[in-house]
């Protein structure tokens, strides 16, 4: 019989429930049995741990080793909470001998136990090992707190240790997270010292906003900050540029009765100095006495550095003096900034004195400051002091670098001590310093400046061999050397080589070449180069314009010179005395002294201050024109305008009075000089002797000579040459030779001008070419031959009609490195025209112009006259027109001849 479906269902359900109940009872019984067995197992292991049996044997049994789990170890460690050393031994034994993988909880239980027993070092080591597992800070905290509760602890020291470890491990943000979990989840508070370390860790990693947030959290849970925490907070506020709150924090710290020290005040002083509120910082330092605090070395150094930042170097020096009086040893940064500031202010002596004083404290400025100080001393021409400072560097153990040596090498080169400069270069190499282009540039410039171009070329070659690329400075220095020797073509070749390498010329390059081109008389090339500056985006400066002005003045083209003065001022470049001086001299040299006076007066009305050199040119102009009264009037105006007459001015006036035989003025000037306490120098005495020698008044000339010696002035080669020249021209050649022989014993060596006096006599009048050639050969041996001496010899050959020998002499002079000039060629052209050999004369003319030598007025007149005599009227007219285009005025003879030719052609 079948049961109804419902009954079957009820019966089935009842069976299942009954089964579940039975199963649950069985499971519960089994769990209780397992727990009991685990407890028995743990107790057994505890007995082993605390017993005297060998752990190696007891714990190696299969019964123990197979059953031992992490939960068992945790229970055993909790059981050793009062004997953490035993627990640590057990922990380490399992790890080292059984390779047991301990749980995080086991680590945390043992850390708690060790900290409780004040065993912080092993606790810290254990914590470090745990954190190597790359666990999340929250996971570590949760397990650590769970174990804290299981162990029924009351101290939060383990959590402090965790935060401190995160700070030491540069995981400051993880430390902050632990702190926040402590105060929000479990109401535990770290120690103040832990929070101080955490806050300073945030400051160290520039988490200033988080540092402030941490501080606020601390205060909100009732933690009372100490001075170290306040210091970190004040530093954070200063870094956040919130100086108002920083000052409020100082006040709050003082109000809470916190045991303060100087450190937070130093931090605030530093913050104020960085914001350039130095005087407020100085005020805080002054107020320290009222707080029973004394400024320390940090206070002073911070203030010195801050004062230097706002350019208050004098006050900074006073602060440094105060610090040194207290026997505080200043920092290198404070000393360096103050020394550098004083140096920039031009107070080199104060800077040097400070360096000497701080050496006693074992402090010295850094190498950069020493280099800058040595450089300033060199620029101030205090070379001895620069060398002493360099020596002092070695004594204090400060090793010079390549910059130091470069500065000193440059100094010695500028002074002409080229051998010393070379020895320093060798010292650089010996000390293993890397050579740069700078010392080579100095050596090249120095050797060019003192005339040794071949050595300069050698240094440039050495540079290139050392794979050092010449710079624009290198090229410009060598160009300047070539220009000074009259080798303008070499200078121009070097310029094209430089630009061909893609090195852009500087303003100094252009100015150097322009000066050289003007000296060589290559005006058109100078103008072309001046215009080329724009192509290189180089703007002319005052010096460039001064070169252009002076160049045109020396050529006598005053209108062009004034055009450049106008252009200069229109471009906003203010002229200086170097601009005006050549204009004044140029006007005077072209017979326009009165116009020069008008120009000078105009400058005075325009508040342009002229120096005595400018006025000397004007005095020279009036004296040259015989206008001595006007010259004396200028002297009065000079005094009224605050310009003192110097020896040069008096020399010009004395020379003028002698040339125009104004004895009254001459003696009046000597008396005036005496009344002013001025003694004639060798230049004035030589001028007086020269004037008397030229008039043949040798008795008076030698009388002045004796007076010169009695007054302590030694005659030089110019003085000797003046008398020798006068004697030669007066026909007293033997006496001149005797005087010349007396020069060397008194350290006056005859120069090319001296020998030129004899050469001039031998090649004029009764020409004695044999003696002239012998003398010139002697001049050549003494390396004294120049263009003038060659010209005299050429003139002598031409006068004797020995044109071939004269022509050979031109070839020889070029071979000797002496450049022919316009006079050289004009002398030859004149002789060729005299012989009616106009064809060769024109060929020589073309050769001259192709070499870049500009013909002068005499040259044009000579060749034009020769062409007219030879019937070459077309060429004569062509030359006259060219002459006029050059701004040169033909003489009367040339004008008459060519004008009559023009009239004949028209008719």
Swiss-Prot record:
Segments traversing the membrane: none
A UniProt-annotated Pfam family: PPR
Family assignment from sequence similarity: Belongs to the PPR family. P subfamily.
Positions of the UniProt region annotated as Disordered: 887-907
Domain of life, source organism: Eukaryota
Keyword Nucleotidyltransferase belongs to the record: no
Biased composition (Low complexity): 891-907
Name of the protein in question: Putative pentatricopeptide repeat-containing protein At5g59900
InterPro entries, sorted: Pentatricopeptide_rpt, TPR-like_helical_dom_sf
PPR repeat segments: 103-137, 155-185, 191-225, 226-260, 261-295, 296-330, 331-365, 366-400, 401-435, 436-470, 471-505, 506-540, 541-575, 576-610, 611-645, 646-680, 681-715, 716-750, 751-782, 786-820, 821-855, 856-890
SUPFAM superfamilies, per the entry: HCP-like (SSF81901)
UniProt source species: Arabidopsis thaliana (Mouse-ear cress)
Signal peptide segment: none
Alphabetic keyword roster: Repeat
């Amino acid at each position: 019989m079948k049961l109804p479906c419902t009954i079957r269902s009820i019966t089935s359900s009842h069976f299942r429930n009954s089964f579940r109940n039975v199963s649950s009872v069985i499971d519960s019984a089994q769990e209780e049995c397992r727990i009991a067995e685990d407890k028995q197992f743990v107790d057994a292991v505890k007995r082993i741990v605390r017993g005297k049996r060998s752990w190696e044997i007891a714990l190696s049994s299969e019964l123990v080793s197979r059953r031992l789990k992490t939960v068992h170890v945790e229970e055993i460690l909790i059981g050793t909470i009062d004997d953490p050393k035993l627990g640590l031994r057990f922990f380490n034994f399992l790890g080292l001998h059984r390779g047991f993988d301990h749980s995080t909880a086991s680590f945390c239980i043992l850390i708690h136990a060790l900290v409780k027993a004040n065993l912080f070092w092993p606790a810290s080591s254990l914590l470090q090992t745990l954190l190597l597992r790359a666990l999340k800070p929250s996971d570590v905290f949760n397990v650590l707190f769970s174990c804290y509760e299981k162990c029924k602890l009351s101290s939060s020291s383990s959590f402090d240790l965790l935060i401190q470890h995160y700070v030491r491990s540069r995981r400051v943000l993880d430390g902050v997270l632990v702190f926040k979990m402590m105060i929000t989840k479990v109401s535990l508070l770290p120690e103040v010292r832990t929070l101080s370390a955490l806050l300073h860790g945030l400051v160290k990693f520039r988490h200033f906003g988080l540092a402030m947030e941490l501080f606020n959290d601390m205060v909100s849970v009732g933690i009372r900050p100490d001075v170290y925490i306040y210091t970190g907070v004040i530093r954070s506020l200063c870094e956040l540029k919130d100086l108002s709150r920083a000052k409020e924090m100082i006040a709050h710290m003082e109000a809470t009765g916190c045991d303060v020290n100087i450190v937070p005040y130093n931090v605030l002083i530093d913050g104020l100095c960085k914001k350039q509120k130095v005087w407020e910082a100085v005020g805080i330092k002054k107020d320290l006495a009222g707080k029973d605090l004394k400024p320390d070395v940090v206070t002073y150094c911070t203030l010195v550095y801050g004062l230097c930042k706002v350019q208050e170097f004098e006050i900074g020096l006073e602060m440094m003096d105060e610090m040194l009086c207290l026997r505080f040893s200043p920092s290198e940064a404070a000393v360096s900034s103050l020394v550098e500031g004083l140096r920039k202010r031009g107070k080199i002596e104060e800077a040097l004195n400070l360096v000497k004083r701080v050496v006693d404290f074992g402090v010295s400025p850094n190498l950069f400051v020493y280099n800058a100080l040595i450089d300033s001393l060199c620029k101030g021409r205090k070379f001895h002091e620069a060398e002493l400072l360099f020596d002092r560097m070695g004594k204090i153990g400060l090793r010079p670098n390549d910059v130091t040596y470069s500065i000193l090498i440059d100094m010695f080169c500028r002074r002409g001590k080229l051998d010393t400069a070379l020895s320093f270069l060798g010292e650089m190499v010996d000390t293993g310093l890397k050579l740069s282009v700078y010392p080579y540039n100095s050596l090249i410039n120095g050797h060019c400046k003192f005339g040794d171009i071949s050595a300069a070329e050698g240094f440039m070659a050495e540079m290139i061999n050392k794979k050092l690329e010449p710079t624009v400075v290198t090229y410009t220095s060598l160009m300047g050397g070539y220009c000074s020797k009259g080798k303008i073509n070499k200078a121009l070749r070097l310029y094209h080589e430089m630009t061909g390498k893609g090195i852009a010329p500087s303003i100094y390059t252009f100015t150097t070449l322009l000066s050289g081109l003007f000296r060589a008389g290559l005006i058109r090339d100078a103008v072309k180069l001046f215009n080329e500056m724009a192509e290189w985006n180089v703007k002319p400066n005052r010096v460039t314009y001064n070169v252009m002005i002076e160049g045109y003045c020396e050529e006598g083209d005053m209108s062009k010179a004034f055009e450049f003065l106008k252009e200069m001022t229109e471009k906003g470049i203010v002229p200086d005395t170097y601009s005006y001086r050549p204009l004044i001299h140029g006007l005077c040299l072209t017979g326009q002294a009165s116009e020069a006076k008008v120009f000078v007066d105009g400058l005075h009305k325009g508040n342009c201050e002229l120096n005595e050199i400018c006025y000397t040119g004007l005095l020279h102009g009036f004296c040259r024109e015989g206008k001595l009264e006007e010259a004396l009037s200028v002297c009065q105006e000079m005094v009224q305008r605050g310009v003192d007459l110097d020896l040069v001015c008096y020399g010009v006036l004395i020379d003028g009075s002698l040339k125009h035989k104004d004895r009254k003025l001459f003696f009046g000037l000597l008396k005036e000089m005496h009344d002013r306490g001025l003694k004639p120098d060798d230049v004035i005495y030589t001028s007086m002797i020269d004037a008397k020698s030229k008039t043949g008044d040798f008795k008076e000339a030698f009388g002045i000579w004796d007076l010169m010696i009695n007054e302590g002035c030694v005659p030089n080669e110019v003085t000797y040459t003046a008398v020798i020249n006068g004697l030669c021209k007066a026909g007293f050649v033997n006496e001149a030779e005797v005087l010349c022989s007396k020069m060397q014993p008194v350290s006056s060596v005859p120069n090319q001008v001296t020998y030129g006096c004899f050469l001039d006599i031998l090649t004029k009048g009764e020409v004695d070419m044999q003696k002239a050639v012998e003398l010139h050969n002697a001049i050549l041996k003494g390396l004294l031959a120049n263009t003038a001496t060659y010209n005299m010899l050429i003139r002598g050959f031409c006068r004797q009609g020995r044109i071939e020998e004269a022509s050979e002499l031109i070839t020889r002079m070029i071979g000797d490195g002496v450049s022919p000039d316009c006079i050289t060629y004009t002398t030859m052209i004149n002789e060729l025209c005299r012989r009616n050999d106009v064809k060769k004369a024109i060929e020589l003319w073309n050769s001259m112009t192709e070499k870049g030598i500009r013909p002068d007025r005499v040259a044009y007149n000579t060749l034009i006259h020769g062409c007219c005599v030879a019937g070459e009227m077309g060429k004569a007219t062509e030359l006259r027109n060219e002459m006029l285009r050059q701004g040169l005025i033909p003489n009367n003879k040339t004008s008459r001849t060519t004008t009559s030719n023009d009239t004949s052609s028209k008719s």
